[in-house]
């Protein structure tokens, strides 16, 4: 599983650390919202169906994990909550919907990434 956080919440946490954090201290920025990739895929399909027309036969394709894949990515973000009084403000599913809409309306951003760059990142041929 992975810990998911909406980008605006993350930015607000960074600003809080810059303004109120103690120099030399570290602050883990987390949401305490751990979901696995399958849960994310199912949520995205549900969001997509509510916004755009997609076929009834949407299927999730399972692929082999990459070498060295970690089973869980999670943070202990108690310190930023306790010391800086910061926590996420956007509910996870709302943040995921906002992210989906951003990509839907800003496709020039990701369409500029070449197939070559994707292959290089994934280490596939």
Roles of regions detected by a PLM:
Residues 1-125:
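C-terminal substrate-binding subdomain of Rossmann-fold SDR/epimerase-dehydratase oxidoreductases
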């Amino acid at each position: 599983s992975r810990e998911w956080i909406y980008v605006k919440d993350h930015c607000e946490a960074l600003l809080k650390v810059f303004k109120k954090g103690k120099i030399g201290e570290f602050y883990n920025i987390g949401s305490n919202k751990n979901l696995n990739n399958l849960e994310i895929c199912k949520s995205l399909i549900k969001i997509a169906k509510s916004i755009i027309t997609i076929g009834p036969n949407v299927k999730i394709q399972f692929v082999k994990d990459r070498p060295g894949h970690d089973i869980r990515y999670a943070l202990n973000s108690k310190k930023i909550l306790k010391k800086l009084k910061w926590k996420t403000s956007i509910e996870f599913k709302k943040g995921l919907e906002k992210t989906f809409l951003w990509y839907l309306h800003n496709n020039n951003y990701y369409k500029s990434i070449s197939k070559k760059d994707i292959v290089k990142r994934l280490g596939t041929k």
